[in-house]
Amino acid sequence: MPELPEVETVCRGLNRLTLEQTIGGGEVLLDRSLAYPVSVEDFQKQITGCRLVGWQRRGKYLLGELRSNQAPGPAGWLGCHLRMTGQLLWTERDQQRPRHTRVVLHFEGGWELRFVDTRTFGKVWLLPGDRPWAEVMTGLGQLGPEPFGADFTAEYLYEKLKSSRRPLKNALLDQRLVAGLGNIYADEVLFFCGFHPTMASNQVSLQDCELIHQQIQATLTAAIEAGGTSFSDYRQVTGINGNYGGMAQVYGREGEPCRHCGTVIAKIKLGGRSAHFCPQCQPKLER
């Protein structure tokens, strides 16, 4: 699943390529990819004649602000969640569409924004301008702070973790704790901290949380600078891969030697998700 660095990379690409261009129409090729409005006809009618004036990211959600060419003021928001296999691709109209194209926006000048999704878990919303986002995209209201936000601090982490017995890896995946962190970067953060993924959350000290906070920000920054990770379906808006995969320390490297000590990287199941770690660099400690 695309995580914060991948979604942020897509957001920056959309801000670079799609702004101030009029949407000439839209197609919904798979009805269930459209979460709101329910009617495809309403979606097509409402989005035609609008232009995108800016994109932002919240957790793993994308939100594009729409303005109408016919009336002043906000016209609404275009929302998207890529889920497991979603892609947003900016491409010329005469290029062949991928097989799993689900929603298409037609722009003036012969360009299209295509929502491509193999497994069909991703969603697109057209949000009214006069309603709070979270009323329609209910998942937004459940998100914790952004990793780079002022309210995400080591002290906040410590208060949230100190009374929980959940494995630390599982806690970091909880979007209510911190928005946007997922399986790839939780593994990487724990490696850089030297913490075993099964370590109980209530075993961390405030000093540990300072390290976790630091490594979350550092790891996500490095991944954003690399354009994200392309292990499977993720692509940037121009269709190219992200480059962080070759920099990964543990994720996706089970059976390979640790880049720091040479110990074979291990993989376990933890709460229905995989966890990759170095048994030497991340020993399981009894505290």
Curated annotation (Swiss-Prot):
Its EC number is 3.2.2.23, 4.2.99.18. Pfam families: Fapy_DNA_glyco, H2TH, zf-FPG_IleRS. SMART domains: Fapy_DNA_glyco, H2TH. A zinc finger (FPG-type) spans 249-283. CDD domains: EcFpg-like_N (cd08966). It comes from the Bacteria. One of its GO terms (molecular function) is damaged DNA binding. Binds 1 zinc ion per subunit. GO terms for biological process: base-excision repair. Gene3D superfamilies: 1.10.8.50, MutM-like, N-terminal. Keywords: DNA damage, DNA repair, DNA-binding, Glycosidase, Hydrolase, Lyase, Metal-binding, Multifunctional enzyme, Zinc, Zinc-finger. The active site is at 2 (schiff-base intermediate with dna), 3 (proton donor), 60 (proton donor), 273 (proton donor). DNA binds at residues 100, 119. It catalyses: Hydrolysis of DNA containing ring-opened 7-methylguanine residues, releasing 2,6-diamino-4-hydroxy-5-(N-methyl)formamidopyrimidine; 2'-deoxyribonucleotide-(2'-deoxyribose 5'-phosphate)-2'-deoxyribonucleotide-DNA = a 3'-end 2'-deoxyribonucleotide-(2,3-dehydro-2,3-deoxyribose 5'-phosphate)-DNA + a 5'-end 5'-phospho-2'-deoxyribonucleoside-DNA + H(+). Its cofactor is Zn(2+). Involved in base excision repair of DNA damaged by oxidation or by mutagenic agents. Acts as a DNA glycosylase that recognizes and removes damaged bases. Has a preference for oxidized purines, such as 7,8-dihydro-8-oxoguanine (8-oxoG). Has AP (apurinic/apyrimidinic) lyase activity and introduces nicks in the DNA strand. Cleaves the DNA backbone by beta-delta elimination to generate a single-strand break at the site of the removed base with both 3'- and 5'-phosphates. Belongs to the FPG family. Monomer. This is Formamidopyrimidine-DNA glycosylase. The gene is mutM.
